[in-house]
C-alpha cells in the first residue's frame, strides 16, 4: 500500500514548483535499461549499465512536480513510460503511480498514460489495468517472425514472436488501444509491402515506423540504415497503404503527422518540430536528459532533486542541438522543410548533415503531392478533406 504521508516526509523541500512557460513532456524510464529481451540493435549498453527500479519516494516527487510544473492552462497531462521493458517495474508500481496522479491532478485536468512495451510480458492483469485507466500502448515488433526472432530474441537467444503475438491478442480481447512500433533497418527495405500486410493482419489500426539509430549495440552489430533504404521502405509503406484503400481504417502515424503538420504548421513529433528540447527523459535514478537518443554527459541536465523542472526545460530548449536543427542551408531551400524540419539531431553525421535526408525527401515528396493544391491553413485542410471523402485511393 502506498503511504503518502511517509513519502511527503521524504520530499526535498521546495517552496513551490514554478510552472514552465512552455509545454513539455518527460519520458519516464522507471527501470532504466532493464529488459527481458536482447535486441541486437538496442542503444542501451545493458552489460555495463547498472539497473535500479525507481523507488516510491522518487516516483512521488516526480509525479507531484511534473503535474505542478505544467504551463498554466494545461488541460491534459500525459505520462509516458518506457524502458528497457517498463512492465518489469511490476503492476504495483503503476497502481502507485495512478494513485499519485489522482491525488495531485488539479480539478478539470485530464491525466493520460502511454506505455511502450515489447509485449511479451502482457497478461490479463496488465490488460485490465490498461483498460480501466485508458492506457495507450505502443508495442515494439519486427515486420515478421523471421526478423523478430533474429533481431529481437530473449536473453537466452530464443524466439519472442509467439509471446509478442499473445500480448497483441490479449490487448484485442480486452479492447486496449495500441499501436505497433516498428524499427526499420536495411534488411527490411525491399519488403515494405509484405511487412505492411503482415502487420495489418494482426489487427493493428495504428502503425509507426522508426529509423534505426546507429548507436550502442547497433554500431557493434553493424547496423546502419541508409537514407536510400529509409526512403525506399517508407514509400513502399505509403504505396501499399494507398493500394489497399486503408485510409480511415489503418493509421500510419508517419503519414498522418506529416499531413497534419502541412496544414497546421505544428508537429506531433519532436523529430520533425522546428526545434526540439521540450521532450525530456528521466532515468530511474532521477537523472534528466535532453533527449531519449542523446543520453550522455553532453546532454545531461542534472538530477530531478537538483533543480526545478522549469529550469531543466529551459536548459534543454537552449541546447544548441535543439535550436539549430533545421538551420542548415540545404534545409532552408528544401521543398519538404515544412514537414521535415531537418529531422532528429541524433541522426547528424560528422559534417552536420542528417544521414537520412535523402530518404525523408523521397518519402515526404510522395505523400505531400496530393496536398500541394491546397492552402496550408485550416481552410485548405477543410477543402482537402472534402475533396477526398470517399476517394481514399487517390489521397
From Swiss-Prot:
Chain positions recorded as S-adenosyl-L-methionine binding sites: 41, 84, 152
Positions annotated to bind [4Fe-4S] cluster 2: 270, 276, 291, 344
Signal peptide from the UniProt entry: none
Classification via Pfam families: Radical_SAM
Family the entry assigns: Belongs to the radical SAM superfamily. Anaerobic sulfatase-maturating enzyme family.
Outcome recorded upon mutating residue 83 to A: Drastic reduction in AtsA activity. Abolition of binding to AtsA. No binding to SAM
Matching PANTHER family: ANAEROBIC SULFATASE-MATURATING ENZYME HOMOLOG ASLB-RELATED
Family matches, as Gene3D superfamilies: Aldolase class I (3.20.20.70)
UniProt protein name: Serine-type anaerobic sulfatase-maturating enzyme
Result of altering residue 24 to L: In strain: Isolate 13
Described purpose of this protein according to its UniProt entry: Involved in 'Ser-type' sulfatase maturation under anaerobic conditions. Catalyzes the post-translational modification of serine ('Ser-72' in the arylsulfatase AtsA) into 3-oxoalanine (also known as C(alpha)-formylglycine (FGly)), by a free radical chemical mechanism initiated via the reductive cleavage of S-adenosyl-L-methionine (SAM). Is capable of catalyzing multiple turnovers. In vitro, use of a peptide substrate in which the target serine is changed to cysteine also gives rise to turnover, supporting approximately 4-fold the activity of that observed with the natural substrate.
Effect of residue 86 to G: Binding to AtsA reduced to 60%. No binding to SAM. Still catalytically active
Result when mutating residue 291 to A: Exhibits reduced solubility and drastically reduced activity
GO cellular component, one term: cytoplasm
Subunit details: Monomer. Interacts with AtsA prior to its export to the periplasm. This interaction depends on the presence of AtsA 'Ser-72'. Binding of SAM to AtsB promotes the formation of a ternary AtsA-AtsB-SAM complex.
Principal location: cytoplasm
Resulting phenotype, residue 270 to A: Unable to activate AtsA. No FGly detectable. No binding to AtsA
Coiled-coil region: none
Ribonucleoprotein among keywords: no
Keywords from the UniProt entry: 4Fe-4S, Cytoplasm, Iron, Iron-sulfur, Metal-binding, Oxidoreductase, S-adenosyl-L-methionine
Gene assigned in the entry: atsB
Entry's cofactor comment: Binds 3 [4Fe-4S] clusters. The first cluster is coordinated with 3 cysteines and an exchangeable S-adenosyl-L-methionine.
Regulation: Activity is inhibited by iron chelators.
Amino acid at each position: 500500500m502506498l503511504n503518502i504521508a511517509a513519502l511527503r516526509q521524504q520530499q526535498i523541500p521546495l517552496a513551490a514548483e514554478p510552472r514552465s512557460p512552455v509545454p513539455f513532456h518527460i519520458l519516464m524510464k522507471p527501470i532504466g535499461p532493464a529488459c527481458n529481451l536482447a535486441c541486437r540493435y538496442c542503444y542501451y549498453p545493458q552489460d555495463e549499465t547498472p539497473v535500479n527500479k525507481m523507488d516510491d519516494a522518487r516516483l512521488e516527487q516526480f509525479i507531484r512536480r511534473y503535474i505542478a510544473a505544467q504551463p498554466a492552462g494545461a488541460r491534459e497531462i500525459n505520462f509516458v513510460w518506457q524502458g528497457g521493458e517498463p512492465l518489469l517495474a511490476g503492476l504495483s508500481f503503476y497502481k502507485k503511480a495512478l494513485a499519485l496522479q489522482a491525488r495531485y491532478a488539479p480539478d478539470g485536468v485530464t491525466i493520460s498514460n502511454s506505455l511502450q512495451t515489447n509485449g511479451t510480458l502482457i497478461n490479463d492483469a496488465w490488460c485490465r489495468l490498461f483498460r480501466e485507466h485508458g492506457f495507450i500502448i505502443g508495442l515494439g515488433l519486427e515486420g515478421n517472425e523471421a526478423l523478430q526472432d533474429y533481431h529481437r530474441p530473449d536473453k537466452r537467444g530464443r524466439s519472442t514472436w509467439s509471446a509478442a503475438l499473445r500480448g497483441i491478442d490479449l490487448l484485442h480481447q480486452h479492447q486496449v488501444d495500441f499501436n505497433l512500433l516498428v524499427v526499420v533497418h536495411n534488411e527490411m527495405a525491399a519488403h515494405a509491402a509484405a511487412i505492411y500486410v503482415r502487420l495489418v493482419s494482426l489487427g493493428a489500426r495504428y502503425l509507426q515506423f522508426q529509423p534505426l539509430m546507429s548507436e550502442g549495440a547497433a554500431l557493434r552489430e553493424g547496423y546502419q540504415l541508409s537514407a536510400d533504404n529509409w526512403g525506399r521502405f517508407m514509400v513502399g509503406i505509403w504505396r501499399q497503404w494507398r493500394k489497399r484503400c486503408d485510409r480511415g481504417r489503418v493509421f500510419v502515424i508517419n503519414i498522418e503527422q506529416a499531413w497534419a503538420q502541412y496544414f497546421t504548421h505544428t508537429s506531433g513529433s519532436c523529430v520533425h518540430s522546428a526545434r526540439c528540447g521540450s521532450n525530456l527523459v528521466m532515468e530511474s535514478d532521477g537523472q534528466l536528459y535532453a533527449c531519449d537518443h542523446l543520453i550522455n554527459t553532453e546532454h545531461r541536465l542534472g538530477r530531478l532533486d537538483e533543480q526545478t523542472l522549469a529550469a531543466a526545460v529551459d536548459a534543454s530548449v537552449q541546447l544548441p542541438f535543439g535550436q539549430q536543427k533545421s538551420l542548415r542551408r540545404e534545409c532552408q531551400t528544401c521543398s519538404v522543410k515544412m514537414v521535415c524540419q531537418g529531422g532528429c539531431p541524433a541522426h547528424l553525421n560528422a559534417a552536420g548533415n542528417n544521414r537520412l535526408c535523402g530518404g525523408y525527401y523521397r518519402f515526404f515528396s510522395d505523400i505531400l503531392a496530393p496536398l500541394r493544391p491546397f492552402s496550408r491553413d485550416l481552410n485548405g485542410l477543410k477543402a482537402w478533406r472534402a475533396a477526398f471523402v470517399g476517394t481514399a485511393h487517390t489521397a
